[in-house]
Amino acid sequence: MNKTVFKSPEAKNKIIRAYDDAITNSSLNLKANVLKTTFGDTHFLEAGSQHQEIVILLHGASSNATSWLSDIAEYSKQYKVIAIDIIGEAGKSAETRPSYETIDFAEWLKEIFDSLNINKANIVGLSQGGWLSLRFATSYPELVDRLILLTPAGIIPTKTTFIIKAILYSLLGTTGRIRINRLVLGSQRVDNKIISFMDLIQTNFKARIEKEYIFSDDELSRLTMPVLFIGGEQDVIRSTQKIARRLQNIVTDFTIIVIPEMGHVLTGLVPRIFPFLNKTKH
């Protein structure tokens, strides 16, 4: 039986209330839906249903689909957007946490594709959502049109210095949370709403802490679709240069964008992503 991923029933309620408030306060025409899967109920947000081509958004760890709201507003002008609450994370989907060592996460996403009759889609994954995107794209490359990886996990290990600091800061309560956020954000300026969101999740959610799964060269060589990697030069969690170098050596159709003024929190990048998405298909 799965233990709850929230720190208490009230902690879960706080996150869900914030989730609902974020949607209410947005001006988006969103549909909220739930799908049954082998791994439990999966909740997702949908916009731009008048468009044919699909963009699927996969958020990072300790997050949920509302983290994409500003991006959904942009993507939905040209694409049908599906922002999924990843199972086992801080959203409205089941609290199931499949193993990173198996292809269960890919099978879960495949069930969503099948249920929604999706033959092919563009996928945008951020951090751990980038890892999930890679797990799916290497398992079912024929279902992915274009792959956009925003500072993805799974290419190189997380920096040991960051892990040590994060563990130490996690013992310091509120002060520690502030320090972790400061460390992750670096000198990057972000909206106060993002900082409040990060603090809410850290206070009320049990982050998943397990051994990382790093994809092999053989697995990454299955990425036959066009791949865009975007990283922040100031990322303290994983080296943007090392990720770019490894992918460049393996992936045939590969594009890199490095943003000097950004760290690990990559927001407002849709204008940079659209040219890649909208390239003429061969």
Give the positions of each predicted feature:
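Alpha/beta-hydrolase fold catalytic core
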Residues: M1-E53, Q78, N119, N278-H282
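Conserved HGGG/HGGXW glycine-rich cap/lid loop of the alpha/beta-hydrolase fold
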Residues: G40-G91
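Active-site loop/oxyanion-hole signature of alpha/beta-hydrolase fold enzymes
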Residues: A83-V124
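Flexible "cap/lid" loop of the alpha/beta hydrolase fold
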Residues: W131-S139, V144-T174
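Hydrophobic, aromatic-rich cap/lid helix
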Residues: D191-D218
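Short beta-strand/loop motif that positions the catalytic acidic residue
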Residues: L223, F229-G231
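Acidic catalytic loop of the alpha/beta-hydrolase fold
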Residues: Q234-R238, H264-V265
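Catalytic histidine-centered segment of alpha/beta-hydrolase-like enzymes
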Residues: M262-R272
